[in-house]
Swiss-Prot record:
A Pfam short name: H2O2_YaaD
Family of this protein: Belongs to the UPF0246 family.
GO biological process, alphabetically ordered: response to hydroperoxide
GO cellular component terms listed in the entry, alphabetical order: cytosol
HAMAP family from the UniProt entry: UPF0246
Record protein name field: UPF0246 protein Fjoh_4905
Length: 252
């Protein structure tokens, strides 16, 4: 099984790491090409490009100036312990037993506007560059177009013929994958909550549930679509009436 998730805007470079293990990102050459473009942007340009405050623009301008390769444990940090948003709250990577790290490293991939595709233990330096940023890179008119061939080829290389491919990323990030070119079907779980008698997709809960689904897969060694349907963390359960084919809906 392979799983893709989105990165997070929030980063944590302070928390003590539970392991000294790390790996090198696969696409640093391509990341340097993207970085070369973003490094030239002034804070005012970053603010407009990313629709962020002046304070955040200044912070990310500094990050862009400081970013450099090669990555080492002294100047970079494993991705799964660095991203700090709702998905990662649900995943709670810090509490994953170390004997399960190999499974996490094998199954999980993180889509990224700067790094393309990261394994959990891949080193990364601080950045902010969402996949939907309308920034031309070379002959590509945006980051989706730049990353799509590389990311899709990498996923196809890793996916075995009958392996499950689970999309737990946002639409913004998953659009960097050429679904038609994938050699396996895509399974897409959705998570909805009943509120005021109505079933809704509530962003915070849905993001957290995506992380919890990754954790469930690792905790239970899930391999089949029926295994996925057994997801029951924090009150969610599979809804057969709302689900169709490879679109799995979980409600609570």
């Amino acid at each position: 099984m392979k799983i893709v998730i989105s990165p997070a805007k929030s980063l944590n470079f302070e928390k003590e790491l539970p392991t000294s293990q790390y790996t090198e990102p696969s696409f640093l050459k391509e990341a340097r090409v993207v970085h070369k473009v973003v490094k030239t942007k002034k804070p005012s340009e970053l603010s407009e490009l990313m629709s962020i405050s002046d304070k955040l623009a200044d912070l990310n301008w500094k990050r862009n100036q400081d970013w450099k390769t090669p990555f080492t444990p002294e100047n970079a940090r494993p991705a799964v312990y660095t991203f700090d948003g709702d998905v990662y709250t649900g995943l709670d990577a810090y509490s994953i037993p170390l004997e399960k790290l190999d499974a996490l490293q094998d199954k999980l991939r993180i889509l990224s506007g700067l790094y393309g595709l990261l394994k959990p233990l891949d080193l990364m330096q601080a950045y902010r560059l969402e996949m939907g940023t309308k920034m031309p890179v070379g002959e590509s008119k945006n980051l989706h177009e730049f990353w799509k061939p590389t990311v899709t080829k990498a996923l196809n290389k890793e996916l075995k013929k009958d392996e499950l491919f689970v999309n737990l990323a946002s639409n913004e990030y998953f659009s960097a994958v050429d679904v038609k070119a994938l050699k396996v079907p895509v399974i897409t779980p959705d998570f909805k909550d009943y509120k005021d008698g109505k079933l809704k997709m509530i962003s915070f809960f849905a993001k957290k549930a995506r992380g919890m689904m990754v954790r469930y897969i690792i905790d239970t060694n899930a391999e089949t679509i029926d295994d996925l349907k057994g997801f029951n963390y924090e009150g969610y359960k599979f809804d057969a009436n709302l689900s169709k084919g490879n679109h799995l809906v979980f409600t609570r």
